[in-house]
C-alpha cells in the first residue's frame, strides 16, 4: 500500500487536563467519551500540540510540554498524534526517503485540526481567542494549514500559533499559502533552532533566533542538527515553567547585553510574548543546560 497514509483512522488525539492526566487516546468518533466533552460547553483554554516527521505525541519532549501547559495555566491540551502519516512506523533506514510524503500530508493533518476546532467552536462554544496551536518541525506547518482552513471555514483566526523550529526542507522557499505564515493566526511566534532541518526564513509576527538560529549550545559535535532541532520544544516547555526566562533582543541591537532590555523593545519567549509591543526578528542568547535562562534575574 501507499507509504505513510493519512486518513482519520491513522490520526488520534491525546487529551490532558488537570482532572484527567492519564493521556488516553481519542479519535473523532470517540471524542465525546472524554469527560470534558460530555459537558455542554468547555470553558478552559485549549492548546493543540503537533509533532513532526518520524515522531509521535508520546515523545518525552511533547509529554513535558503538555505537562507544563496543564500545570501552569489549566489548559486542555490536545496532542495530535499523526505518526503513521509522519512516517514514524516506516523501516528505520528508509524513513528519510518518505520525507516528501510526510511533508505533503501536513495540509491534511491541518485540515483535521480545523475540523476538531469547528466542533469546539460550534458545539462547545469555545472562542477562537482561547485556542492556541503549538507545532514542531512539520507540525509547525500543520498548524499553519489549520490556521488557513479555519479562516476558510469562517471561524476567524486562532489567537496564536507557535512554530517550534518549523521544517525548512520542502517549505522554506514556498509562498505563504504553502507553509506556516504570519497571517495564519492573530499572532505567530517562531523559534529558530537549526538552519538545516529548520529554516532561517522569517515566518512569523515575531521570529526568535535562539543562539542565532543555528547549532544550539550543549548539543555537541555529533547529531548536532537533530539535537538543535528538538531543542525548540524543550525551550518552550522551560519558558512555560519559568516565565520570562528567555529574553529576545531585536536583531538590530543584538550586540547589546540583555541587561539593557526594556519592555518596549525586547520580548519574552513563550505564552506572554504577544503581550509585548515589539515585532520582528529577535536574537536570543541561550545557556547550554536547562533551564537555559538568559535573564539573570531580570524580568521585563
UniProtKB/Swiss-Prot annotation:
Q: Which GO terms describe its molecular function?
A: phospholipase A1 activity
Task: Kindly give the InterPro entries that the UniProt entry links to this protein.
Answer: AB_hydrolase_fold, Allerg_PlipaseA1, Lipase, Lipase_N, TAG_lipase
Catalysed reactions listed for this entry = a 1,2-diacyl-sn-glycero-3-phosphocholine + H2O = a 2-acyl-sn-glycero-3-phosphocholine + a fatty acid + H(+)
SUPFAM superfamilies per UniProt = alpha/beta-Hydrolases (SSF53474)
GO BP annotation list: lipid catabolic process
Compartments where located: Secreted
> What does the UniProt keyword field contain?
Allergen, Disulfide bond, Hydrolase, Lipid degradation, Lipid metabolism, Secreted
Catalytic-site annotation from UniProt: 137 (nucleophile), 165 (charge relay system), 229 (charge relay system)
The record's PROSITE patterns line, in alphabetical order, gives:
LIPASE_SER (PS00120)
**Cystine connections:** 4-87, 176-181, 219-227, 244-268, 245-293, 261-266
Keyword Nucleus in record: no
Q: What is its EC number?
A: 3.1.1.32
A single GO CC term for this protein reads: extracellular space
Where is it expressed, tissue-wise? Expressed by the venom gland.
The UniProt similarity line reads: Belongs to the AB hydrolase superfamily. Lipase family.
Record's function text: Catalyzes the hydrolysis of phosphatidylcholine with phospholipase A1 activity. May act as an allergen and induce hemolytic activity.
The cross-references to PANTHER family, in alphabetical order and at most eight, read: LIPASE (PTHR11610), LIPASE MEMBER H-A-LIKE PROTEIN (PTHR11610:SF178)
Protein name per the record: Phospholipase A1
Native source species? Vespula germanica (German yellow jacket)
Amino acid at each position: 500500500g501507499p507509504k505513510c497514509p493519512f486518513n482519520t483512522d491513522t490520526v488520534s488525539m491525546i487529551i490532558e487536563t488537570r482532572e484527567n492526566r492519564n493521556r488516553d487516546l481519542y479519535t473523532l468518533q470517540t471524542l465525546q467519551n472524554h469527560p470534558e466533552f460530555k459537558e455542554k460547553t468547555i470553558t478552559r483554554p485549549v492548546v493543540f500540540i503537533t509533532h513532526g516527521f518520524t515522531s509521535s505525541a508520546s515523545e518525552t519532549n511533547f509529554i513535558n510540554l503538555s505537562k507544563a501547559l496543564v500545570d501552569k495555566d489549566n489548559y486542555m491540551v490536545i496532542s495530535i498524534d499523526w505518526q503513521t502519516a509522519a512516517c514514524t512506523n516506516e523501516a528505520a533506514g528508509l524513513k528519510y526517503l518518505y520525507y516528501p510524503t510526510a511533508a505533503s500530508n501536513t495540509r491534511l493533518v491541518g485540515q483535521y485540526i480545523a475540523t476538531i476546532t469547528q466542533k469546539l467552536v460550534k458545539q462547545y462554544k469555545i472562542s477562537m481567542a482561547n485556542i492556541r496551536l503549538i507545532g514542531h518541525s512539520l507540525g509547525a506547518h500543520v498548524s499553519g494549514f489549520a490556521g488557513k482552513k479555519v479562516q476558510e471555514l469562517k471561524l476567524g483566526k486562532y489567537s496564536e500559533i507557535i512554530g517550534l523550529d518549523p521544517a525548512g526542507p520542502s517549505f522554506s522557499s514556498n509562498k505563504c499559502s504553502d507553509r506556516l505564515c504570519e497571517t495564519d493566526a492573530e499572532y505567530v511566534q517562531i523559534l529558530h533552532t537549526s538552519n538545516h532541518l529548520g529554516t532561517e526564513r522569517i515566518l512569523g509576527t515575531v521570529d526568535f533566533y535562539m543562539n542565532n538560529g543555528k547549532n544550539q549550545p550543549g548539543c555537541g559535535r555529533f547529531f548536532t542538527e537533530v539535537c538543535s532541532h528538538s531543542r525548540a520544544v524543550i525551550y518552550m516547555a522551560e519558558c512555560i515553567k519559568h516565565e520570562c526566562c528567555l529574553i529576545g533582543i531585536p536583531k538590530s541591537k543584538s550586540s547589546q547585553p540583555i541587561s539593557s532590555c526594556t519592555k518596549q523593545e525586547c520580548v519574552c519567549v513563550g505564552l506572554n510574548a504577544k503581550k509585548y509591543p515589539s515585532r520582528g526578528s529577535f536574537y536570543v542568547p541561550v545557556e547550554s543546560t536547562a533551564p537555559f535562562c538568559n535573564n539573570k534575574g531580570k524580568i521585563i
